[in-house]
Regions:
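Glycine-rich phosphate-binding loops of nucleotide-dependent enzymes
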Residues: 2-250
């Protein structure tokens, strides 16, 4: 079995009297989609904040790419290969899809303050951005203004932007949110194909998507890991069925 690409060991985070993550241990292996599910308030967002470096754990450790990154800032984790998409789309709506990806590439390369006009003149950069759009199925929409894209296309664009840094691990925070059935199915198919490029930690409420995609699933309830295992193990777990999947057990 391969060494985990990302692992946490007994992460604890408190907000006053609220224990948001209670000794959470989870890992993601290379080429794996590991889904993190749980009801609202389960601690998923707090856990992701600790993984990205936006929140510091009170105790516990985080390892990524063979290093202890518990106290590393966000930008250092990005440099190591940690990418993220957000629960709410973060594209620049007034710019084209190609501009969005080009700006993401140059930001990752350390040129965040170049003017957009300079970016548009950089043929090498724009070719790379076009390849990024082609990879997520948006090549034909390169010149479309982001605000004119469908919600599903904006999600694909955001993933293209996250992939601009060639991450080893991608954190996907509710990528199906707000999508219709057909858009969700297309994104599921795309994420399946993405597994060969990077591992993924998927935070998602769409159970059809979760069980279609995940190699393993971890269930959080009240900040604790209730269960972790394969799709079949989670489906059959009596506590999960009762507490989260909404089924009565006998």
């Amino acid at each position: 079995m391969s060494e985990p690409l990302l692992s946490t060991d007994r992460l604890v985070k408190r907000f006053g009297g609220l224990l948001a993550t209670d000794n959470v241990s989870v890992d993601v292996r290379p080429g794996e989609i590991h889904a993190l599910i749980g009801p609202n308030g389960a601690g998923k967002t707090t856990l992701v904040g600790q993984l990205t470096g936006n929140l510091a754990p009170d105790s516990g450790t985080i390892r990524f790419a063979g290093r202890d990154v518990t106290r590393l800032p966000t930008h250092a984790r990005v440099r190591l290969g940690l990418g993220r998409s957000f629960q709410i789309t973060s594209v620049l709506r007034e710019f084209s899809a190609l501009d969005n990806v080009a700006l993401a590439i140059q930001a990752h390369d350390g040129h965040s303050f170049r003017f957009l006009g300079d970016v548009r003149k950089d043929r090498k950069l724009r070719d790379a951005a076009q390849r990024g759009l082609d990879a997520v199925g948006l090549g034909a929409r390169a010149n479309a203004i982001a605000s004119a894209l469908s919600h599903g296309e904006q999600r694909q664009l955001e993933i293209a932007m996250a992939l601009a840094g060639e991450p080893r691990l991608l954190l996907l925070d509710e990528p199906m949110a707000g999508m219709g059935v057909e858009e969700s199915q297309r994104l599921v198919a795309f994420l399946h194909g993405l597994k060969s490029r990077c591992g993924m930690l998927l935070i998602e409420h769409d159970m059809d998507a979760v069980f279609a995609l995940a190699d393993r699933i971890t269930v959080l309830v009240y900040g604790r890991v209730l269960a972790s295992g394969t799709r079949d193990e989670i489906r059959a777990h009596p506590d999960v069925r009762q507490a989260y999947l909404g089924e009565e057990t006998t």
